[in-house]
Amino acid sequence: MTAHADLSPTLQLAIDLIRRPSVTPVDADCQKQMMQRLGDAGFQLEPMRIEDVDNFWATHGKGDGPVLCFAGHTDVVPTGPVTAWQIDPFNAVIDEHGMLCGRGAADMKGSLASMTVAAERFVADYPDHKGKVAFLITSDEEGPAHHGTKAVVERLAARNERLDWCIVGEPSSTTLVGDVVKNGRRGSLGAKLTVRGVQGHVAYPHLAKNPIHLAAPALAELAAEHWDHGNDFFPPTSFQISNVNSGTGATNVIPGDLVAVFNFRFSTESTVEGLQKRVADILDKHGLDWHIDWALSGLPFLTEPGALLDAVSSSIKDITGRETKASTSGGTSDGRFIATMGTQVVELGPVNATIHQVNERVLAADLDVLTEIYYQTLIKLLA
C-alpha cells in the first residue's frame, strides 16, 4: 500500500475525509477540514448550522460575473454489518488493485476532495478570475434533507444570491469516470392512500364494505395508466405501488380500511397538480371513500445543452478522450433544490457501482482524473 505522504493532494484529502465517521446527519468535522483548506486558499467562509445539520457556503472572487458552485455532502449512509467489510469502513485504504476502499469513497468524499483541490489550484493560478467560485456543502443529503441544501438555498435566495452554474459531485459515472453526467432528474411525488370501508364478519358481507375489494380495481387502473410519453430527455412517468396494508390479522374479519403507499417518478411532461387530479378522478370513478396524504420530494429539473454542460463535456473529452453521455436516470439528488434558483445543474462524480454497498470503493486514480476535469471546467467558465 502507498504511504499517505506519497499520494496526490486529492487522495490525501479523500482519505482524511473518509476516516471521519460522518454517518448522516453527523459531519464529524469533515466540513471544518474543508473550510480550513478553502479559507487558506482565500475563500470567504460562512458556516450555516441549521437545527442538527452542519452546512457551509464559501465564495472566492469579487466580480459581478457568473457564479460557478460546487455542491456536495459530507454525510454518508450507515455501513451495515462491519463484519461484512473486508476492511474497517472508516479506515480508508488503497488496496493492491488501486481501489480506494471505505464508506463514502464514491458517495461522495472522493468528489469533495477532487473539487476542493481543483478549486485551490484554480484560484492560485487565476487569482483574478471572472465571477465567483462557490461551495455549498451539507451533512444532510443522505437523511431527511430538510435542513441541508434545501434550507441553505432558501437563505441564499432570500438575500438575492445568484448561482449561474452548479456541479454536484454525485457519483454519476457508470463504468469509467466521466462516461455519464446527470443533466437532470425526475421529480418524486409520494402518496399514502387510505380507502375506508366498513368492518364486519366475513360470513355477513352484506353488513360490511370490504375496502380491499373496493380498492383493488382502482389500484389496478392506476398501475395500468399511461401518465405521459416522456420526451427527448426523460422516460415516461412511472407509477409504483410500494406497500398495501389491510386487515386485522384475523381470518374471519372484513377490515375497515386499506392503506396503499405509491410513488410517481415524473418527467417534465407532467405536473404535480395534473397527477394529483388524475389520481383523484380514477378513485372517484370507482366510488371510493378515500383520503390521500401527498409528499413531494422534488420537482423534475433539466439542464439543456449550454455553457455548463458544454464546458463539462469538453473537459471530460480533453482529459479522458471520451465522449460523455448526459442522462436523467436515477433517484433524486440535492440538485433539485439548487435548480429552483434557475441554476444550470450538472452532476459529475466517480463510478457509482458500489455506492451504499458493503466494501464501497472507487479507483483511486479516478479521483485525480476527476480533479483535472473539475479544474479544466473552472478554466473554461471563469478564467
UniProtKB/Swiss-Prot annotation:
Output the SUPFAM superfamilies linked to this UniProt entry: Bacterial exopeptidase dimerisation domain, Zn-dependent exopeptidases
Give the metabolic or biological pathway: Amino-acid biosynthesis; L-lysine biosynthesis via DAP pathway; LL-2,6-diaminopimelate from (S)-tetrahydrodipicolinate (succinylase route): step 3/3
Gene Ontology molecular function terms on file: acetylornithine deacetylase activity; cobalt ion binding; succinyl-diaminopimelate desuccinylase activity; zinc ion binding
**Which cofactors does this protein require?**
Zn(2+); Co(2+)
The annotation note on the cofactor reads: Binds 2 Zn(2+) or Co(2+) ions per subunit.
**Top-rank lineage group of the source organism:** Bacteria
Q: Which InterPro entries match?
A: ArgE/DapE_CS (IPR001261), Bact_exopeptidase_dim_dom (IPR036264), DapE_proteobac (IPR005941), Peptidase_M20 (IPR002933), Peptidase_M20_dimer (IPR011650), Peptidase_M20A (IPR050072)
The UniProt record lists the keyword Phosphoprotein: no
GO terms, biological process: diaminopimelate biosynthetic process; L-arginine biosynthetic process; lysine biosynthetic process via diaminopimelate
Keywords per UniProt: Amino-acid biosynthesis, Cobalt, Diaminopimelate biosynthesis, Hydrolase, Lysine biosynthesis, Metal-binding, Zinc
Q: Which residues form the active site?
A: D75, E141
Function statement: Catalyzes the hydrolysis of N-succinyl-L,L-diaminopimelic acid (SDAP), forming succinate and LL-2,6-diaminopimelate (DAP), an intermediate involved in the bacterial biosynthesis of lysine and meso-diaminopimelic acid, an essential component of bacterial cell walls.
Member of which family? Belongs to the peptidase M20A family. DapE subfamily.
* Protein name per its UniProtKB record: Succinyl-diaminopimelate desuccinylase
**Whose protein is this, by species?**
Pseudomonas fluorescens (strain Pf0-1)
